[in-house]
Amino acid sequence: MPTARQALLDAAHRALDEGPWRTVRMVDVAAVAGVSRQTLYNEFGTKGGLAGALLRRAADGYLAGVDRALTAPAPDRPAAVALWTVRAARQDALVKALLTGCWAEGLPRPEHRPGPRGRTAGRPPPTPEELVALVRERMVAVSPGAAAGRCEIALRLALSCVIVPVPGDDAADSRALGLVREGARVAVPAGLSGPSRTAGGRSPR
């Protein structure tokens, strides 16, 4: 059985699927979740706090998918992460916005203003640079040496597909995945080292 917090986040996400964030009302979110409005405010403090928690959950879910992709056989890991990145961004506009920093009309945005905070307000959602760095760190940790370079290239190519999506369904994703594999292989031939440490904090371009 979901906790009150999980139920509230689920209700908020459903409300976002049905209309722009600016029209989402806290009282309606609480009603759909089956909890009191006071419980909602205790958890998140403000509507901005709810938005931040929704964004953090989207980021955490995306990173959990990255971890699953990295359980693939070593040669397939860069492509598996790339495919997950493209699909996750296509399926969830919040993930796409978190990865690219491009916030479509109607999406909640991170807020950094001081104000009331719920008892579990927690950390702010990651910036695109921070989120990509977390993915890169995970990829490099399980792919030492030249494979780290292929991970870097695969991630950059995947983000390019997120910014300019390939039209179509899973078949189109598979074609894009083939391009990612080939691009990573050509860009970082066997025997070359991984990306420079000094480049670790830079966002893909």
Residue ranges of model-derived segments:
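Amphipathic alpha-helical linker/stalk segments
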Residues: 56-80
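An extended, acidic
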Residues: 79-205
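Residue-level recognition of oxygen-bearing side chains
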Residues: 46-49, 94
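Basic, helix-initiating cap at the start of DNA-binding domains
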Residues: 1-32, 49-52, 57
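Solvent-exposed, amphipathic alpha-helical segments
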Residues: 11-18, 61-69, 156-165
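Short hydrophobic/aromatic patch on the recognition helix
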Residues: 33-44
